[in-house]
UniProtKB/Swiss-Prot annotation:
The gene is ggt. Keywords: Acyltransferase, Glutathione biosynthesis, Hydrolase, Protease, Secreted, Signal, Transferase, Zymogen. This enzyme consists of two polypeptide chains, which are synthesized in precursor form from a single polypeptide. InterPro entries: GGT_bact, GGT_CS, GGT_lsub_C, GGT_peptidase, GGT_ssub, Ntn_hydrolases_N. It comes from Bacillus subtilis (strain 168). The active site is at 403 (nucleophile). This is Glutathione hydrolase proenzyme. The keyword ATP-binding does not apply.
Amino acid sequence: MKRTWNVCLTALLSVLLVAGSVPFHAEAKKPPKSYDEYKQVDVGKDGMVATAHPLASEIGADVLKKGGNAIDAAVAIQFALNVTEPMMSGIGGGGFMMVYDGKTKDTTIIDSRERAPAGATPDMFLDENGKAIPFSERVTKGTAVGVPGTLKGLEEALDKWGTRSMKQLITPSIKLAEKGFPIDSVLAEAISDYQEKLSRTAAKDVFLPNGEPLKEGDTLIQKDLAKTFKLIRSKGTDAFYKGKFAKTLSDTVQDFGGSMTEKDLENYDITIDEPIWGDYQGYQIATTPPPSSGGIFLLQMLKILDHFNLSQYDVRSWEKYQLLAETMHLSYADRASYAGDPEFVNVPLKGLLHPDYIKERQQLINLDQVNKKPKAGDPWKYQEGSANYKQVEQPKDKVEGQTTHFTVADRWGNVVSYTTTIEQLFGTGIMVPDYGVILNNELTDFDAIPGGANEVQPNKRPLSSMTPTILFKDDKPVLTVGSPGGATIISSVLQTILYHIEYGMELKAAVEEPRIYTNSMSSYRYEDGVPKDVLSKLNGMGHKFGTSPVDIGNVQSISIDHENGTFKGVADSSRNGAAIGINLKRK
């Protein structure tokens, strides 16, 4: 699955070695001569970084080497990924950053999920006949753009835990955007596949110079993005949420049919949340609460599967995949019916994880038979309250988004697990002219047809699947897991945990083990490596796995060995990611 190329990167040395008046800068050592020479697995005594792009990993690792903590490194990495993976995340989007504070032992989530503008309406994704506008159309319109939260989230994280300033941490990414870097295979493929979307906006001048898509090995220069980063460096987040940039951003959204105003940007705020917790085979799991559906349904699936002693079956047996698929169908049915922004709707968290409800769902799973009509259950029987919404059938035409996940741990015990996104590849494709910021299409994560828990409302956050997760043993963090991939995120995190803990696989093997995803009887995916005879058996039972495998997710993970004092980082081979361990010289 690993995509490689052999373009010399030594010219980047001048980009990443930052000089100037600021006393501390994140820097990167002279990179190897090709991206594929970076390690997907590394070990460190003093910290670890694992991201989906080697240059972002270098920048984060350099923060740790120079005395910054995991939160400082995470902020620097997010800016770097905005440059190196512009199709996946950035300051035009949002995300969920989970932080374990090594000093206080508290685990906290910075929720920078985008919000709908004040002008958003429940029916804004319906046509004049009251029918849902096709996903392919609504995904590129201004109505799809949510008020971005990433920058506010980074600011809050630094205020709470940081030891370096945003001014310092953004500088290497300014240099990277100004001077450029060689495009890798993942970005090149994205530009080629989405050139029609990019050609409609200011993005064409960046990614399609002279009308032709940039290719692998070409240098990507983003001078307008560098200019925006410089504004943020000098004026802070107000440079984004107020003033000339805010006006240009909101005007651009309106030009593409949206309603966002400067006031929407000025009024945006993040939330600081506690994780939702669960137990699994002696581990305590901290994961994301609503408005992400990721955590609650990760825990629900783990609880359902724990009953079946999954590892009695071979890891690539039809029995294992049958139990996974049936469990996914039930949990994703619940997700579609009961999950939404808790500031607006009642989410039955206790009911969904209640032991009696879990038993009820387990009884619907038969090893030898496919449940042809998996439906949502009634978790409200197991807790007080009731739904303030209906169950509304939605169109089946949504394309799962991308995103990026990265993770950092430092020598002081701080741990970050961070999933961040602009939703689809290149979001809406809309770029803020003269500023180089690509805008998300996050509002298409709302239901197109109103009435359900996830209908569009002003200031509401659309339902997410992002699942940054930290596992604890004896109250100490021992494993971070997360992935991109839209609704597939939950299944990728689930399977990584199952393979590492239930099956006892070494971490890299657990990350690389072929994954499946199915949220209903009409939607199936599987990765290369699932045996053909197993697929035939499953399809003979009534499943509908297709003929072509696809990559599912892109897991980055860190395991922490407290006894030996080591960190092990793993980057998934489905992108050109890198794990970099920190080993400081001892005097």
